[in-house]
Amino acid sequence: MKFLDQAKVYVRSGNGGGGCVSFRREAYVEYGGPDGGDGGKGGDVWVEAVEGLNTLIDYRYKQHFKADTGMHGMGRNRTGSGGEDVVLQVPAGTQLLDEDKEEILADLTEIGQRVLLARGGDGGKGNSHFKTSTNQAPRKTIPGWPGEERWIWLRLKLIADVGLVGLPNAGKSTFLSVVSKANPKIAAYPFTTLYPNLGVVDLGPGSRFIVADIPGLIEGAHEGAGIGDRFLGHIERCASLIHLIDGTQDDVVAAYKTVRGELEAYGDGLPEKQEILALNKIDAMDEAMVAEKRAELEAASGKTVMTLSGVSGDGVKALCGSAWDIVLQNRRAEKAAAEAAEKGEEGWAPS
């Protein structure tokens, strides 16, 4: 399935059905009076986050969504049926923006979360509403109210526990394919990964987390260089980062600083995320070279640097274990915060 993280769609809710002109006609009832029913309400347009989706590709080929019009009222004071709603299904992590992309209308971060995009028009009034002492047979009705229409942008920011970052050819796709059942494209040239890939790492019962392989960043990515600008936003949802560095390149410190610089320039909390720094491709290096480049990275970053090889598998399990420790820590913190907030709401009372 192709990946698409932005789509522009047009939505229109249904018009309300019109009120009815009708008069009671029954045997032995000489003056039946008006009995025109009201029109039905027009259908609404909703957007809902559902399970099993991780792309907006469905909205590349279909961009117009219109709900049904409400049925007109009928005689014997029967109200027309309401128009059928339209529900746009999107992945969790989808943001809704107005047409000029300046205002975020909603952020769907949880499965089942729903937002009303366009409310259907109310139904009109039948002639039974307009009977008076001086007008026993009114022919007046009120038509249904029109629906709403608008253009909106859907923007997906993947929700993952860990984001894989690094320069092109750092070995991120190979690592993801080894630790999960994901099947990203792998080749020995830059920008093999053109779109984010998701994989589930399973370390045992109750020890699973999601990893997002973010396409390779280059210097100037935050300004639109390369392909990194569009996908830096996906890292915002990740609780932590694994920063892979190709150990076979000449200057590993420069590679580290380039990616860190892009994260800091982009902002939005990216520089503050917990980061695991790892020197990759040690299968193509001797022990002395590994030790030398590891020491250079530790001196430049002030962090402990892990070593691994996605090809041979050396160090992969240890790296996943470290990532899981951070994921578990973050989940516990989120749970504690949610419980504290819930407790605070329960304990609130008007003064």
Curated annotation (Swiss-Prot):
<keyword id="KW-0342">GTP-binding</keyword>
<dbReference type="GO" id="GO:0042254">
    <property type="term" value="P:ribosome biogenesis"/>
</dbReference>
<dbReference type="Pfam" id="PF01018">
    <property type="entry name" value="GTP1_OBG"/>
</dbReference>
<dbReference type="Pfam" id="PF01926">
    <property type="entry name" value="MMR_HSR1"/>
</dbReference>
<dbReference type="GO" id="GO:0005525">
    <property type="term" value="F:GTP binding"/>
</dbReference>
<feature type="binding site">
    <location>
        <begin position="213"/>
        <end position="216"/>
    </location>
    <ligand>
        <name>GTP</name>
    </ligand>
</feature>
<dbReference type="InterPro" id="IPR036726">
    <property type="entry name" value="GTP1_OBG_dom_sf"/>
</dbReference>
<dbReference type="GO" id="GO:0000287">
    <property type="term" value="F:magnesium ion binding"/>
</dbReference>
<dbReference type="InterPro" id="IPR027417">
    <property type="entry name" value="P-loop_NTPase"/>
</dbReference>
<dbReference type="InterPro" id="IPR006169">
    <property type="entry name" value="GTP1_OBG_dom"/>
</dbReference>
<feature type="binding site">
    <location>
        <begin position="309"/>
        <end position="311"/>
    </location>
    <ligand>
        <name>GTP</name>
    </ligand>
</feature>
<keyword id="KW-0547">Nucleotide-binding</keyword>
<keyword id="KW-0378">Hydrolase</keyword>
<comment type="similarity">
    <text>Belongs to the TRAFAC class OBG-HflX-like GTPase superfamily. OBG GTPase family.</text>
</comment>
<feature type="binding site">
    <location>
        <position position="193"/>
    </location>
    <ligand>
        <name>Mg(2+)</name>
    </ligand>
</feature>
<feature type="binding site">
    <location>
        <begin position="280"/>
        <end position="283"/>
    </location>
    <ligand>
        <name>GTP</name>
    </ligand>
</feature>
<feature type="binding site">
    <location>
        <position position="173"/>
    </location>
    <ligand>
        <name>Mg(2+)</name>
    </ligand>
</feature>
<dbReference type="InterPro" id="IPR014100">
    <property type="entry name" value="GTP-bd_Obg/CgtA"/>
</dbReference>
<keyword id="KW-0460">Magnesium</keyword>
<dbReference type="InterPro" id="IPR031167">
    <property type="entry name" value="G_OBG"/>
</dbReference>
<keyword id="KW-0479">Metal-binding</keyword>
<comment type="subunit">
    <text>Monomer.</text>
</comment>
<feature type="domain" description="Obg">
    <location>
        <begin position="1"/>
        <end position="159"/>
    </location>
</feature>
<dbReference type="InterPro" id="IPR006073">
    <property type="entry name" value="GTP-bd"/>
</dbReference>
<protein>
    <recommendedName>
        <fullName>GTPase Obg</fullName>
        <ecNumber>3.6.5.-</ecNumber>
    </recommendedName>
</protein>
<dbReference type="GO" id="GO:0003924">
    <property type="term" value="F:GTPase activity"/>
</dbReference>
<dbReference type="InterPro" id="IPR045086">
    <property type="entry name" value="OBG_GTPase"/>
</dbReference>
<comment type="function">
    <text>An essential GTPase which binds GTP, GDP and possibly (p)ppGpp with moderate affinity, with high nucleotide exchange rates and a fairly low GTP hydrolysis rate. Plays a role in control of the cell cycle, stress response, ribosome biogenesis and in those bacteria that undergo differentiation, in morphogenesis control.</text>
</comment>
<dbReference type="GO" id="GO:0005737">
    <property type="term" value="C:cytoplasm"/>
</dbReference>
<dbReference type="InterPro" id="IPR006074">
    <property type="entry name" value="GTP1-OBG_CS"/>
</dbReference>
<feature type="binding site">
    <location>
        <begin position="191"/>
        <end position="195"/>
    </location>
    <ligand>
        <name>GTP</name>
    </ligand>
</feature>
<feature type="domain" description="OBG-type G">
    <location>
        <begin position="160"/>
        <end position="328"/>
    </location>
</feature>
<feature type="binding site">
    <location>
        <begin position="166"/>
        <end position="173"/>
    </location>
    <ligand>
        <name>GTP</name>
    </ligand>
</feature>
<keyword id="KW-0963">Cytoplasm</keyword>
